[in-house]
């Protein structure tokens, strides 16, 4: 039994009655197993949130995996939320900007990167951002933040971040993609809006959606690989896979490995 099948079994045990379980397995039997193109291996990495230590460890594991199991085309897909919450947001971006990888890397945008760029042009958003780890990001750039800052202080902090933000970080964040597709898989930070074709999804939904997506059991036409909503362990459903395991708090950064029709975790 593969990881994909185990995920369906585990989800069925937790959430389905017996009739629903039989229905879920009939659905899987009718459809071919999701796969990536021949000769391609994907490493999808969940929300990093300022944990440069975990990122470095994961990149080393990926390098070791490629060295011991070479593949024609390797692709790293980062699902966004590189910053906030953890202590080393600047160091995470430094590492990703350097990107001295010998294979393709795809960097997706998360809602926390949106917070940062919005703060630069709309300082009062700090009142919200500070509750989601924004102060930790400011501190990683050498800025001493003020809790419950007034409008003048918010503007000063935004100006300080604007000065401290390296041009390489600015370009990196500005070039982040909203989604990525490969084979039978669609990658986005938060998920997708049910009922809307994948090619017509709004960036707001790709970055922010939660319940409407998480509670949906319909077929999205591809398996959606996402983060955004922390779970204790990777959550495999028939229509989506969540790999945000709350790295900033748990110390567990998850990488999903896809090759042919096989799925496992690192």
Model features per residue range: what roles?
Residues 30-38, 67-68, 96-99, 178-181, ...:
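A short acidic-Thr-Gly-centered motif at the start of a beta-strand
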């Amino acid at each position: 039994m593969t990881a994909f099948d185990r995920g369906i079994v585990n989800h069925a045990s937790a959430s389905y009655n017996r009739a629903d379980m039989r229905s879920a397995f009939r659905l899987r039997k009718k459809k071919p197993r999701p796969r990536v193109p021949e000769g391609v291996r994907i490493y999808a990495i969940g929300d990093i949130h300022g944990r440069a230590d975990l990122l470095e460890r994961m990149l080393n594991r990926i390098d070791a995996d490629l060295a011991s199991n070479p593949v024609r085309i390797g692709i790293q897909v980062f699902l966004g939320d590189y910053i906030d919450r953890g202590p080393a947001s600047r160091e995470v971006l430094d590492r990703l900007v350097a990107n001295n990888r010998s294979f393709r890397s795809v960097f997706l945008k998360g809602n926390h990167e949106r917070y940062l760029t919005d703060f630069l042009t709309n300082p009062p958003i700090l009142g919200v951002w500070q509750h989601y780890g924004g102060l930790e990001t400011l501190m990683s750039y050498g800025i001493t933040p003020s809790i419950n800052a007034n409008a003048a202080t918010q503007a000063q902090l935004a100006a300080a971040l604007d000065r401290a933000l390296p041009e390489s970080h600015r370009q990196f964040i500005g070039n982040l993609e909203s989604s990525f597709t490969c084979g039978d898989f669609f990658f986005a930070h938060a998920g997708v809006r049910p009922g809307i074709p994948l090619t017509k999804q709004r960036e707001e939904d790709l970055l922010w959606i939660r319940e409407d997506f998480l509670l949906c059991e319909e077929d999205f036409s591809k398996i959606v690989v996402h983060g955004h909503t922390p779970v204790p362990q990777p959550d495999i459903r028939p229509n989506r896979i969540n790999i945000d395991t709350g790295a900033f708090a748990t110390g567990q950064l998850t990488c999903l490995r896809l090759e042919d029709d096989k799925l496992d975790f690192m």
